[in-house]
């Protein structure tokens, strides 16, 4: 009976992250056209193309900056006060952010739009808390499976959100409708959490565990290498997605519906990658997932700039999407496995903060890379993917050497 309850709770968590990511990604197809197209009126008609790109970068960068600040803190609060109360707080804050975004777009108010991104980023620690909840209910054998299913939910959200948002904006002619739909979806998610998720107490302390600040947790020797790999891995993903829409708008003049279709085309392989990762995790070490996933991802990212037709782009989405999901599974499980049960929320909050915070690095480094050519952000993403594969390989070799040394010492 307990196993049935655990599985039921897990699928509610999958629905929760699906709605959370769908709500976040609903407005994504409209942000680039909203800021880059002078006819939309978000900026003055005299604004230069360069200044429009800068403001787009600021709007995109505020979200990860404040998630980097908020996610570890909210995760730590969930360790102390329980997952459900803090998850509820997150959703209320995110809902307020989406409402401000809708008003900012409707009124063409740049300050409101900027404030909305601050609120959305700071309170969007819900995915980290859901991952901590999945870790709480997992055994070492089921953790990779449970995390893979959470990833499937996130990727499904990336399919539903941009499709609904892109079509809603084009059909209605009102770009604020996508944000209002995000408000509605977040409200449904909040009700789902309040009604269906059990309110479990914090993890009982078997021994007194000294509290760690975010900086101290980041520096833990068992975690630091995997946090670095997380930053590199998501740096590649964020470089890819940050300049994904910009490339398609500038090079191919795609509209919000076409951008939404592109998001679907890359998200479907990501869902497939989560399923493949779940199957491989039954037989492979986590390091093998990290190596293979990041190499496959790097290959897809490198090929993205080559095609000029939609079907060619779709072919590059297959390795990119599959590799991203396998790489994410490898990094998330590695961090969770090396974190104390009483620090799962804080560790996964820091993980999500680094994951989304890597977008800041992507915006800064990618903006400089754009000076060399619009394809250079994708070259840098490829390099980050290769470095991640090498990092997992190096950590695996080090672990094998320590294991061999221990085996040689033990008989003596």
Model regions: which residues?
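Cytoplasmic helix-loop-helix junction between adjacent transmembrane helices
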Residues: 116-153
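Hydrophobic core of transmembrane alpha-helices in multi-pass small-molecule transporters
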Residues: 18, 97, 110-125, 312-326
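Short amphipathic helix-loop junctions that connect adjacent transmembrane helices
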Residues: 30-53, 242-258
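Conserved MFS/SLC helix-loop-helix module at the cytosolic interface between two early adjacent transmembrane helices
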Residues: 68-105
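Juxtamembrane intracellular "pre-TM" segments in multi-pass secondary transporters
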Residues: 1-6, 198-227
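Helix-to-loop junctions at the C-terminal end of transmembrane segments
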Residues: 69-82, 273-286, 370
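C-terminal ends and interior cores of transmembrane alpha-helices
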Residues: 92-107, 296-308
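Symmetry-related core transmembrane helices of the 12-TM Major Facilitator Superfamily/SLC fold
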Residues: 177-194, 378-394
């Amino acid at each position: 009976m307990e196993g049935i309850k655990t599985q039921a709770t897990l699928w509610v968590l999958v629905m929760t992250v699906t709605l959370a990511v769908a709500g976040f990604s609903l407005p994504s197809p409209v942000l680039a056209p909203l800021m880059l197209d002078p006819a939309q009126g978000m900026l003055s008609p005299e604004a230069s193309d360069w200044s429009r790109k800068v403001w787009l970068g600021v709007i995109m960068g505020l979200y990860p900056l404040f998630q980097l600040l908020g996610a570890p803190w909210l995760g730590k609060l969930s360790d102390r006060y329980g997952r459900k109360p803090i998850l509820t707080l997150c959703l209320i804050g995110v809902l307020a952010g989406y409402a401000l975004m809708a008003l900012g777009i409707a009124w063409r108010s740049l300050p409101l739009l900027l404030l909305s991104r601050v609120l959305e980023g700071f309170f969007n620690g819900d995915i980290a808390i859901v991952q901590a909840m999945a870790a709480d209910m997992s055994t070492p054998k089921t953790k990779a499976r449970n995390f893979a299913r959470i990833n499937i939910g996130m990727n499904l959200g990336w399919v539903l959100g941009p499709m609904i948002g892109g079509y809603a904006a084009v059909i209605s002619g009102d770009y604020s409708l996508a944000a209002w739909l995000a408000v509605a979806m977040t409200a449904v998610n909040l009700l789902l959490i309040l009604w269906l998720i059990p309110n479990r107490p914090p993890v009982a302390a078997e021994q007194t565990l000294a509290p760690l600040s975010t900086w101290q947790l980041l520096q833990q020797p068992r975690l630091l290498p995997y946090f670095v790999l997380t930053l590199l891995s998501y740096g590649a993903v964020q470089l890819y997605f940050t300049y994904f829409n910009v490339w398609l708008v500038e090079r191919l003049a795609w509209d919000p519906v076409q951008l939404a279709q592109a998001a679907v085309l890359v998200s479907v392989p990501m869902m497939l990658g989560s399923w493949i990762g779940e199957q491989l995790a039954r037989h492979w070490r986590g390091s093998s997932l990290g190596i293979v996933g990041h190499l496959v991802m790097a290959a897809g990212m490198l090929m993205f700039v080559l095609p000029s037709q939609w079907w060619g782009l779709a072919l590059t989405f297959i390795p990119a999407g599959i590799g991203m999901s396998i790489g994410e599974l490898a990094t998330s499980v590695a961090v969770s496995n090396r974190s104390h049960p009483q620090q799962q929320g804080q560790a996964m909050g820091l993980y999500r903060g680094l994951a989304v915070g890597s977008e800041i690095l992507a915006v800064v480094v990618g903006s400089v890379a754009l000076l060399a050519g619009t394809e250079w952000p994708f070259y840098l993403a490829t390099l980050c993917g290769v470095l991640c594969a090498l990092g997992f390989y190096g950590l695996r070799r080090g672990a094998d050497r320590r294991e061999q040394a221990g085996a040689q010492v033990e008989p003596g």
